[in-house]
């Protein structure tokens, strides 16, 4: 009998060391399976240890946190012209690893943003503030079992992020993000910082 998975991960007090991790780049096309086979579209980033040196040493598995996107003005989810930042912030869950069910030979970073987009955003700049770990990477006997676990990952990420210590300060979230508290205690300023500002 399968062991029941926890519905929430991480302490109420907020992310613990070594988190958060930061990752950024332009959204690239992946294997084309997220939407077609799984019904769970992904926005992928290149795995580049020269940009994200920590990625070589962390476990392959499922992580969660916040993603910010710099969408073109023509995109339906693009921020209004009155917004102080070109970035919009959404909750996300992501896989870092080889996806053994598909026998991948290269490590990938596949991000599922927890929002239903009405248009693609390939090549858009994306930043990730990775706050915690959900589970190890594993193989599956069937596609159905894989999809079930991914959907559970999404639920765990939503619930885990919907706490005051995990929600960014300053009302940074896109208006469509459904959380109880729109303003939390987490420093998420890097997610929306202009490109010409110094990094933290």
Curated annotation (Swiss-Prot):
One of the GO BP terms on file: riboflavin biosynthetic process
Taxonomy, superkingdom: Eukaryota
Catalysed reactions, as listed in the record: riboflavin + ATP = FMN + ADP + H(+)
Pfam families cross-referenced by the UniProt entry: Flavokinase (PF01687)
Lipoprotein found in the keyword field: no
Binding residues for Mg(2+): 42, 44
EC number: 2.7.1.26
GO annotation, cellular component aspect: mitochondrion
Cofactor(s), by name: Zn(2+); Mg(2+)
A single GO molecular function term of this UniProt record: riboflavin kinase activity
Record pathway: Cofactor biosynthesis; FMN biosynthesis; FMN from riboflavin (ATP route): step 1/1
Keyword tRNA processing carried by entry: no
Primary role: Catalyzes the phosphorylation of riboflavin (vitamin B2) to form flavin mononucleotide (FMN) coenzyme.
Sequence similarity: Belongs to the flavokinase family.
Protein name, entry field: Riboflavin kinase
